Amino acid sequence: MADLAKLVDELSALTVLEAAELSKLLEEKWGVSAAAPVAVAAVAAEAAAPVEEKTEFDVILVDAGDKKINVIKEVRAITNLGLKEAKDLVEGAPKPVKEAVSKDEAASIKKKLEEAGAKVELK
């Protein structure tokens, strides 16, 4: 243990140029490189976690707006609900109109409901 402490003291006393020379000598003697593997870390970060694109969406009726009757008609057409069920859904907003639908179908439903006067969001 005393030898290690003595070695640490001697290494601490080296100048920067002497430390660089020591590094080169050790690299040659042991056949290694003191360069940091930066490229490997960058590649690992890129392959870490691919972002998955969402494939299923929920269409949420946030607010029916001023034209409730038009929104109720659209909800009935989209969901095949009866008049009372569609009315309850619209008046109980925010509620899901359709769940787990494709991106295209969700966008189509959102467009129809917004044209009828509703506020809609996709989740």
UniProtKB/Swiss-Prot annotation:
Subunit structure: Homodimer. Part of the ribosomal stalk of the 50S ribosomal subunit. Forms a multimeric L10(L12)X complex, where L10 forms an elongated spine to which 2 to 4 L12 dimers bind in a sequential fashion. Binds GTP-bound translation factors.
UniProt GO cellular component terms: cytosolic large ribosomal subunit
Functional note: Forms part of the ribosomal stalk which helps the ribosome interact with GTP-bound translation factors. Is thus essential for accurate translation.
Membership in a protein family: Belongs to the bacterial ribosomal protein bL12 family.
Disulfide cysteine pairs (residue numbers): none
Organism: Rhodospirillum rubrum (strain ATCC 11170 / ATH 1.1.1 / DSM 467 / LMG 4362 / NCIMB 8255 / S1)
Pfam short name (any one): Ribosomal_L12
GO function terms (MF aspect): mRNA binding; structural constituent of ribosome
Gene Ontology BP term (one): translation
Keyword entries, A-Z: Ribonucleoprotein, Ribosomal protein
PANTHER family: 39S RIBOSOMAL PROTEIN L12 (PTHR45987), LARGE RIBOSOMAL SUBUNIT PROTEIN BL12M (PTHR45987:SF4)
InterPro entries reported in the protein's UniProt record: Ribosomal_bL12 (IPR000206), Ribosomal_bL12_C (IPR013823), Ribosomal_bL12_C/ClpS-like (IPR014719), Ribosomal_bL12_oligo (IPR008932), Ribosomal_bL12_oligo_N_sf (IPR036235)
Protein name in the entry: Large ribosomal subunit protein bL12
